[in-house]
C-alpha cells in the first residue's frame, strides 16, 4: 500500500504552505523517507528490502546456504553444563528461571514473523539453538567486559549456540531490565542467520548505511537517536522493521500470525508483552507483523502529543517517544485511537476508523471510505485530494462540532479559486454544502473539473456552517 501523497507532485504544494494542519500531515507522511538513491550525512539510505538483504548478507539459514523462503522446524535447549564456550570462556552457569521465561518469549517473537517452529529438547539431545551463561574469560578472570555473543547456523559444534555473561545485571534479570530481553532477541537473531547490519562487532567499526540503528533493527549496535528517533532510554523486546524483512527472506512470512481482529497498545489482545500497554508509563517500542483481520492501534491511555501513521513501512511517535512504532511491509492496520494530547492521526488506503480522543487533534483519513471521530477539543479534518473521499464511497465525520472543529480543504485550493456555490455551474473549483434535515447530515461536495458532477463528497453528522467551519 503506497503512502498517501507520495506519488503526487506535492512538494510544490507544500512550499505554498496550504495550512499548518496540512503541513503536519505532509511532514509525517514524509518522515524518514528511505532508499531511492538517497544519501544522508554521507551514508546511503537503504530501502526495507535492501536492509533485509544486508542483515542476511551471509545467506545462511538452518536450511543451508543460499536457500531462501523455506520453513524450518527447529529445536532449542537450555544447557545444563559446559566446559567452556567456543571462544574459550569458562565459569558456566545454567539459565535461571527468569532467563528461561524471557528466552522463550524472545523465540516466540521470531516465530511470529517467519515460518519457524521451536521445540524444546533436554538431556543428551542435540539442538539447533542453545543457551548458556559464562562468568570468566579464556584466562579464567571474571569477565565484566562482554555482554553476549552467538553463532550463525551451520554444521559445526558452535553453530546456533548463544552465550551470555552472567556477571551483567540485565543478563541475570532480563524480566526486570529491558536490555537483557533485547540481548536475548538479538542473539537468537544471530542463531537464525541474521548479522549485524554493518561489519562491526562489540561497538567497533561504523554503520554501513543510514538506517543502521536500533530504530530499524534489533541487530544494530547504534542508538535510534542517530536516525531521529528517541526511545528515552528504553529498548525493544522484539524484532524491528528491517529484521522482519530479513527473517522472512530466509524462512518465508508466517501468514498464520494474528489473522483475527487485533488490538495493539491499550486493551491489547495480542498476548505479546511488547505489543501491550498496561499503563501510561509503559514505553511501547515495536514493529507490527500481522497476517490478516481488522486491526487497531489503541494509544488512548497516553496524554502526550502523538503522531500516528497507519501506512505500511511508516514510523509513529507514541507515548512520548519518537519513531518508536512501525508497520512492516504487507501489513494493513485499519484503525487508530489517539489519547488525550493533541494528536495527529493518518490513515491509509483502507476504510479506516480514526478516533482522535481528547485534545486538539488533526485527522487525515487518506484513501478509502473512512469514519472519523475528532473527539473533544478543537479538531481539524484534512483533505488533500479528491481521491481522499469519493462520491461512491465517501468519508463520514461522525462527531463534528460546528464553530469548534474545522474541515481543511486548503490543499485542494491550489489555484486559489475554490469557492462555495448554491449549485454547480459547470466551472471548476466549486464547493456545494447541502443540509439533509431528515437525516441530520451535511453533504459536502467538490467539483474541480469543468462539469456539474462532483468528484468528492464527505458526509458530516450535524449541520455545518460554510463561514465558520472550513479552512479554504
Swiss-Prot record:
Record-listed Ca(2+) 6 binding positions: 366, 368, 370, 388, 395
Cofactors, names only: Ca(2+); Zn(2+)
Binding site residues for Ca(2+) 5: 357, 359, 361, 374, 379
UniProt repeat feature Hemolysin-type calcium-binding, residue ranges: 337-354, 355-372
InterPro entries assigned to the protein according to its UniProt record, in alphabetical order: Hemolysin-typ_Ca-bd_CS, Hemolysn_Ca-bd, MetalloPept_cat_dom_sf, Pept_M10_metallopeptidase, Pept_M10B, Peptidase_M10B_C, Peptidase_Metallo, Serralysin-like
Domain of life per record: Bacteria
GO MF annotation terms: calcium ion binding; metalloendopeptidase activity; zinc ion binding
Cofactor: record remark: Binds 7 Ca(2+) ions per subunit.
Comment field (misc): Could be the homolog of prtC from strain EC16.
Listed name of the protein: Serralysin A
Native source organism of the sequence: Dickeya chrysanthemi (Pectobacterium chrysanthemi)
Phylogenetic lineage: Bacteria, Pseudomonadati, Pseudomonadota, Gammaproteobacteria, Enterobacterales
Gene: prtA
